Amino acid sequence: MLFRSVYFLEKNFTFKNFLQSQDFVNNVGKISEEEGHHPDISFGWGYAKVTITTHAIEGLSENDFILAAKIDKIS
């Protein structure tokens, strides 16, 4: 069964090309591993979309906002 919380943080990021998008996603992955909290990410040529939620509580937690702030810092 697939589940998606009604409560989530989501942001679209734009870049000049695919490699910049890929580098951003790789950096998000590193931050996520450090935090132990992992977003859903989709990306392609010139864009990345990051969606953050806490599945265990079916909503938002403090960790979501911390991760979002750290991702914003590298964008």
Predicted regions and their residues:
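Short arginine-rich
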Residues: N27-P39
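Short, well-ordered beta-strand elements within core beta-sheets of diverse protein domains
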Residues: F8-K16
